[in-house]
Amino acid sequence: MDAKKKFLCGLFIVGLLGLSSCGGPSSDSEGEIRETQETQQTVQEENGLVYEGSMELQYAENFSVDYYEGGYEMLGTMDGTQILLVPEGKEVPEGLGKDVIVLYRPVSDLYLVSSSVMDMFRELDALSAIRFSAQKQENWYIEEAREAMQEGRIQYAGKYNRPDYEKIVAENCTLAIENRMILHAPEVMEKLEEFGIPVMIEYSSLEKHPLGRVE
């Protein structure tokens, strides 16, 4: 992966993990996501969060990252999913909407179903945030992922349509990162959420620009 793609490929993961980054402005990224951002900002102001700015995206249109005073961040995807990142040692703001997913930093114990995202975690040296994989060790083309599974740092937890609920619940999975295939198995999403495991679908495959798919 060339230097430009390395810089772009992980902006959403950067936001998710609370790493430091910046992107360049682009009018291409201000279309479909603008309404979601405005809705998020209105809701978050009501929750006592003070808006400071947003991550500038060059190509991607299907997600947003907004910054708030105190180190809080709100991630949004095109389906309306909102994830609030709470800084270490801080509390969840009062009055937060019941549909907002809350993650505490440092983020850990993720269940990664969307295999294409693994390379982004690798490039950002953030494999330690992943605890569960929907791919078996022998099926990974990414050497670091194979090694992590061989050493037990990442565990196989079943495919998207047949996750090992017992394992991921027992080991306190914090978030399932799915691809669009999960839309064909809504009962799995419902079951995960029933067990208290929030679900986020990554929509990089819908990005119009090739670089938007890796941003």
Pin down the residues of each PLM region.
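Sec-dependent bacterial lipoprotein signal peptides
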Residues: M1-S20
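Bacterial Sec-exported substrate-binding components of ABC uptake systems
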Residues: C22-M118
